[in-house]
């Protein structure tokens, strides 16, 4: 017996040297593994099983692999118990039997084997071979994470991110992602980047987020490529580079990434550098259609917009409505807003303002900013029946919370909410809050907000000088809308709040005409001022 033990140890040592060499010499290792395995060495039994499972140094032989794993597993060797469990779970070389897999994982996990703890956790998480138990899954991930098992650290991070089996905690989730990322777990690298981008469990850090996305992208991760592309597309955390964005989106698209398809389609739709070729319409539609065919609802909706507008495809309102309904049925709020606008304008359907409002409110409840504005505006103006100012304020305030100063609907909604507070419409009258909202909308580029703020000071607060400054700010910071230019022109004409200056009044009236667009009131009043001054239009 002592001689057998010594011989087993010698052969096992020889096999380990050959197997663990750089590079491994599998063909030379297998005979030594067989000899030591025949003497019952568990490491050699398990390792020889692995060689048979993957055809390393010997022919691929799954039944033999299972038999060898079982020999070592029966001797209590955790790696073999784990490998045997994986064969049972995946049905590799045998009929799938997750329950039998769970049996062997329980044995290995009880001995503290990290991989088994992790894999058993996935079974409890999904309810495969065992009764679903999210708390048990999280505990098992925690046990393996404590031992430094990267996949478990990542999975535990997901548990804390989503509140799955544990109380939701973004800080702990980020910590686990960082632990796994430090070991090169690419999905964890990406998730950590997302947390830094969104400010989850830490302060927002767009630069750090872009760096992590770049790390994931360099490893070939399509999520990382898509998110890094978005950073370059928007100039978030990196210098804006539309061409680089297009390149990265394309890399992710080549891997079948649906969000990248959608975003790249928009690059072509907007004709940005790198996506501005003569065939850009065809490419945009092709990408929208490709993503839509795989169930990406944003692309379903935007393909509908292409059909509604006849952009890149023949105009087909019936097809547009079909696509909008498909996306709306799947809960896409933007599609609900599109259906509302079709009902409002009578495009493809008979005009129905009540149906339009219903769709707008559905989209608003889903968080779509355009739908929130449209619902609020319909209710504020009573376009679908009796006005409901309180409900209008509700949707304007929901829109305000989204903090989207780059969106016209947001700027207009904040201005309109200011109007509600100014006049006590659907909310208690509050000039201070109205001023704050007007300033916020104005600073985001809304000309009417500066005009309304000026009017409030001119009419309610009887302060023409302050009104003039607000009008002036609107003239200087906003390039659309002639209201501020006209109002300031009238103050200069009459010497109210400013020193009378008819030349300045004429100059501003002409600017108001230039910016008026189709605003008939501004055109009429600016023309009248020029006529009074005997000036050319």
Ranges and model annotations:
Residues 7-35, 39, 50-53, 158:
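Alpha-helical segment of the N-proximal tetratricopeptide repeat
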Residues 2-3, 513-537:
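Terminal, low-structured helical/coil segments at or just beyond the last alpha-helical repeat
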Residues 471-474, 499-517:
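TPR/TPR-like (Sel1-like) alpha-helical repeat modules
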Residues 14-20, 47-54, 83-90, 119-126, ...:
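Hydrophobic face of amphipathic alpha-helices that form TPR/SEL1-like repeat modules
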Residues 35-36, 71-72, 107-108, 143-144, ...:
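Canonical positions in the second alpha-helix
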Residues 6, 39-41, 54-56, 75-77, ...:
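Short helix-capping/linker turns of helical repeat alpha-solenoids
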